[in-house]
């Protein structure tokens, strides 16, 4: 942006947007510029074709807009939460590995997932008889129902769906129902944010008690890049303190401007034994060969492959996330000297 324009702007409050008026350089198409200010060190600028909704629910700032690069986007508290151009990649990666791993998922719990795309992916499985979606923000869900049909594709109206507007942890505390698969698709663990209590050991212990034998949990695993991997590693350690098998995987989600992490947690599923051919057969048997846009056996196997430094990081001991205790990142991995002798067996798998 021109320095003289930037100098005249008021300071940006954290987790908010600042909107420029239409940009005359874009040939009079009325484009609006939005600055994403969710990172304390970087800001990202987006050209918006059209703003469909801008406002605040009880819980968060919301912007739904059409963009030039990512088509329609949902932005929450100053960051892109989901984009039409790549939401199917993200949601397939979050949901389908757990659903494919379970032989016959019948009862599924979704915590978060307000856009409805997580629900859409769950309901793609004919075996599902009940999909309970618990999202704290009723207003956001209604906005997504109105403006983000490409995401939910009518899933909210499926008779198998039970939609509840309440805190996911409170729901588990009051309802003793058991589930075959649980999908956690909540916003990042911002300090003092409503989702913070959904990332702790105590929450996962409660969640574990609501799984049937053979159950699988899939978790949105935060940014998982070389510049920001410690929160994911802490989340993986926390899950390992409760579940016998925890496996990280990641993929680049373009609209997130980073690699993104996911986790599978259970007491039985070892993804190291997965074969691409077996995954392809499960997809064809459970969904049909043309259902998924992105996922197949080769790609999913590749998502679990980590570089040597990341394997070392994930194998390190460290604190887990606890109720009421802020997360403090350990020293950078570059500050730790390591070689083959220091690489634990877990890090070599």
From Swiss-Prot:
UniProt entry tagged with the keyword Transferase: yes
Positions annotated as active site in the UniProt record: 185
E.C. designation(s): 2.5.1.16
InterPro entries the record matches: PABS, PABS_CS, SAM-dependent_MTases_sf, Spermi_synthase, Spermidine_synt_N, Spermidine_synt_N_sf
Localization per record: Cytoplasm
Predominant place of localization: cytoplasm
SUPFAM superfamilies (UniProt xref): S-adenosyl-L-methionine-dependent methyltransferases
Subunit structure comment from the entry: Homodimer or homotetramer.
Record protein name field: Polyamine aminopropyltransferase 2
Gene designation: speE2
